[in-house]
């Protein structure tokens, strides 16, 4: 069954966690669940989410809980993904795995990605673009850049050629998030999405939606909606 949205959200209260090394046979995992991908390039696809623990940033609008994690063996992860991909008749009906967080690139995820690909899953990574890992070229990487102390963090040069799409979070009342910035996407003709920020305030959210639509029409960017929130699923 789809999991309901957790009412606890980070909102920048998470510790900034360090980058992990290792062979990737064990990963810090917050949760693994099946749902419908609610946003971005695979919106609407039945998906299995692997939510990894910890992040190297602490964004004060973060609407996800990712600190309640455990160190799990990769074989356990793969076994759970396989079981979740099967329907009531034991047929595989879910073919997309989304690895998110937190920040997935904080951990050595290359082995997990390759093993998922070997099992004929599509793999999508959601990252903030500040870290780099060497990943199989078949992996879809969606980058959602965040604002640092001096404006938007540029996407790492070594990551840019591998990115499938860039997603900008839009807020009318936070100046830094009220624009579509240049963070390296134009040089590689990377598709751009805009998505309104969820600020847990109906008036602010309506204003954010209006601005996101305006920016999409002005720039040609695609509008991304968090449809999973409308459906009440994670």
Curated annotation (Swiss-Prot):
Catalytic activities: 6-carboxy-5,6,7,8-tetrahydropterin + H(+) = 7-carboxy-7-deazaguanine + NH4(+)
Highest taxon of source: Bacteria
Pathway stated in the Swiss-Prot or TrEMBL entry: Purine metabolism; 7-cyano-7-deazaguanine biosynthesis
Gene Ontology annotations of biological process type: queuosine biosynthetic process
Function statement: Catalyzes the complex heterocyclic radical-mediated conversion of 6-carboxy-5,6,7,8-tetrahydropterin (CPH4) to 7-carboxy-7-deazaguanine (CDG), a step common to the biosynthetic pathways of all 7-deazapurine-containing compounds.
Domain Radical SAM core: 42-234
Gene3D superfamilies the record matches: Aldolase class I
Gene Ontology molecular function, alphabetical: 4 iron, 4 sulfur cluster binding; carbon-nitrogen lyase activity; magnesium ion binding; S-adenosyl-L-methionine binding
Binding, [4Fe-4S] cluster: 55, 59, 62
Assembly and interaction partners: Homodimer.
Cofactor binding: number and manner: Binds 1 [4Fe-4S] cluster. The cluster is coordinated with 3 cysteines and an exchangeable S-adenosyl-L-methionine. Binds 1 S-adenosyl-L-methionine per subunit.
Cofactors: [4Fe-4S] cluster; S-adenosyl-L-methionine; Mg(2+)
Residues that, per the record, bind S-adenosyl-L-methionine: 102, 144-146, 195-198
Family: Belongs to the radical SAM superfamily. 7-carboxy-7-deazaguanine synthase family.
Record HAMAP family: QueE
Binding site for Mg(2+): 64
Name of protein: 7-carboxy-7-deazaguanine synthase
EC number: 4.3.99.3
Binding site for substrate: 36-38, 51, 100
